[in-house]
Amino acid sequence: MSEHIILNPDETFTLNLGPQHPATHGVLRVKLTMDGEYIYSAETVIGYIHRMHEKMGENRTYNQYLPNLSRLDYLSAMAYCHGYVLAVEKAGSIEVPERAEYIRAITVELNRLSSHLVWFGAFIMDLGGFSPLMYAFDDREQILDLLESITGSRLTYCYYRFGGLYNDIDDEFLVGTRKFIIRMRKSLKTYRDLVTNNIILMKRLKDIGHISPEICRKYGATGPVARGSGINFDVRKNEPYSVYNEFDFDIPVYHEGDSYARYMVRMDEMEQSLRIIEQAMDKLPGGPIIPEKKPKIIKLPEGDYYSTVEAARGSFGIRLVSDGGKNAYRLKLRSPTFSNMHLFDEVCQGMLIADALALMGSLDLVIPEIDR
C-alpha cells in the first residue's frame, strides 16, 4: 500500500477488469475495489478456460500426452515439452543423443526469444505505444519461420520425443539462424534507442510496482519477476540440465524490484539467449537425434519423480508419480505464471489503476498456463 495515499474503505466502488479485456492478455478477471483511481484491494479470479490438463496426463499414455504440453504456455511451448520429456527420460533412464540435446537448447532459446518479443510488443502497447509491437512481431516472424521449417508448426510444436527429437535440423536452418542472430542484435540496439532509454517509459515504470524479495519468496515467484527483485536464481545455472553446463552465459539480475527492473531483465535475457544459440551451433556434434532402440510403449518404474526447467516466465516443474503403468498415476504441473500472478493482489494495493496495468504487464501473464 502506498504510504502517500490514505484510502477510505467507506468510499469505494467495485470495478471488474476483464474477463474480456486486452490488458489482462487472456481470459482473466480482476475484481478491483477502487477509491477514485486508486486501488484499495484486488482479487484475481481464474477458471474461465480450465481444461483439466493434469487429469488428462493421468488418463493418457506418456506419448499421447505430449501434445498437451504445447498448449499450456503457447508462447513458450518448447520449454514445457522439454520439461516433460526430461521428467520421463529421468524416470525411465532413457538416454538422449548429444546432438539432440544441443538442438533442444537451440530451439528452446529461439522459442524464449519469440516469447520475450511478444511480451515486449504487448507490454509497450499496454503503456500506450504501438510501433514497437510491429517491430517485435517482424523479428518474431523470422523465428517462427525457422521453427516451422523443422517442426511443421508455428506455435504448438510438439517437436520433442522421449530420447530425442521428431526431426533433425539441416544446414539451411543453421545458416538462417546465424542470419537471424545478426539481425536480432541490430534490433536489440533499435529497441534500446527507441524504447528502453525513452524518458516516458522510465516515468511509467521506474519506482512503480515494487516487488520485494520477501514477496517473491512468499508467493513462489520465479523467472524475470524474481530476478528483477534481486533473487539470482535461474534453473539453467543453479540446477543445470540438458547441456546448459556447456555454455557460457550470464543471468541478468536487477535489485530495484520495480516494473522497469523486470523490463530490463527480459531485454538483457534476449542477448543471453543469442549467446547460447551461437555456442550450441558452434559445438553441435554429428550423430543421431534419437536412439536406435527405444521402447514404443513407455512404462516407468514405480516412484515419485520431479523435473524442472527454466521457461520464459520462470521455473516450470513436473511432478510425476508412476505406479508402473502406461500412464502417470499423478501428474502435477508447477506453473511459474500461476505463482507470479498471485502477488499482484498484494502489490497493487494503493496504486493508480494505470500503474497497476503496467505492473500486470511486467509480470508477463499467459492465462492458458494458469488455467490448466
UniProtKB/Swiss-Prot annotation:
Its EC number is 7.1.1.-. Keywords: Cell inner membrane, Cell membrane, Membrane, NAD, Quinone, Translocase, Transport, Ubiquinone. It catalyses: a quinone + NADH + 5 H(+)(in) = a quinol + NAD(+) + 4 H(+)(out). It is a peripheral membrane protein. InterPro entries: NADH_Q_OxRdtase_suD (IPR001135), NDH1_su_D/H (IPR022885), NiFe-Hase_large (IPR029014). It is found in: Cell inner membrane. Its main location: membrane. GO terms for molecular function: NAD binding; NADH:ubiquinone reductase (non-electrogenic) activity; quinone binding. One of its GO terms (cellular component) is plasma membrane. Belongs to the complex I 49 kDa subunit family. NDH-1 is composed of 14 different subunits. Subunits NuoB, C, D, E, F, and G constitute the peripheral sector of the complex. PANTHER family: NADH DEHYDROGENASE [UBIQUINONE] IRON-SULFUR PROTEIN 2, MITOCHONDRIAL, NADH-UBIQUINONE OXIDOREDUCTASE 49 KDA SUBUNIT. NCBIfam families: PRK06075.1. NDH-1 shuttles electrons from NADH, via FMN and iron-sulfur (Fe-S) centers, to quinones in the respiratory chain. The immediate electron acceptor for the enzyme in this species is believed to be ubiquinone. Couples the redox reaction to proton translocation (for every two electrons transferred, four hydrogen ions are translocated across the cytoplasmic membrane), and thus conserves the redox energy in a proton gradient. This is NADH-quinone oxidoreductase subunit D.
